[in-house]
Amino acid sequence: MQEALHCPVGFDTDVNGSVLGEVTFGQAQGKKCVMYLTIGTGVGGGIYSNGELHHGMLHPETGHVLITKRTADTYAGRCPYHKNCLEGLAAGPAIEERWGRKAVDLADCPEVWELEADYIAQALTGYVMTVSPEMIILGGGVMHQEQLFPLIRKKLKEYINGYIVTDELADMEHYVVPASLHAVSYTHLTLPTT
């Protein structure tokens, strides 16, 4: 591939590619620490910090942080390892199993999105406390439900409860944001020819 493209080629996870794209071409340009979380058929995350993608011993398993279930939520969770992790409770298949319909068909059901926002905000609170990102970008099919963003921001602020006070957290609309590059056209780019 390197010979055909005349440039270095590497492989990584899709979400690391997403966070790198946002830092390089998108709304996270100039940020030193950014987290990208995709919530769709599963949940995955990429972390960019001080010019590098975070790998550690493996890639971050951000979808498997444990969540405290709401008492009224009788859904067991679908993750075969944890049941009550973010992916097991909040990914698209979990929404469909819990409510009996796909997320796209539940847009007008506020109870669905209140619960979803609560679980996502719990996970984001953990990431804020441990990763300390300057921006959190949310992508994936579930996040196409635009009503989720204000609900997540509100719950995240409640969960942080004033423990951390920063300019970023004071401006939640620019702190927890939707992915920006999915709607960008790349027709202006020219690939090398052989």
Mark where each language-model region is.
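Active-site-adjacent loop/helix segments that line or gate small-molecule/cofactor pockets in enzymes
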Residues: 15-19
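Short secondary-structure boundary segments
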Residues: 39-41, 140-141
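A short acidic/small-residue loop/turn micro-motif
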Residues: 60-63
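ATP-binding/phosphotransfer module of carbohydrate and carboxylate kinases, centering on a glycine-rich
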Residues: 1-7, 21-31, 47, 53, ...
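Short glycine-aspartate micro-motif
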Residues: 34-38, 44
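General beta-strand structural signal in soluble alpha/beta enzymes
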Residues: 9-14
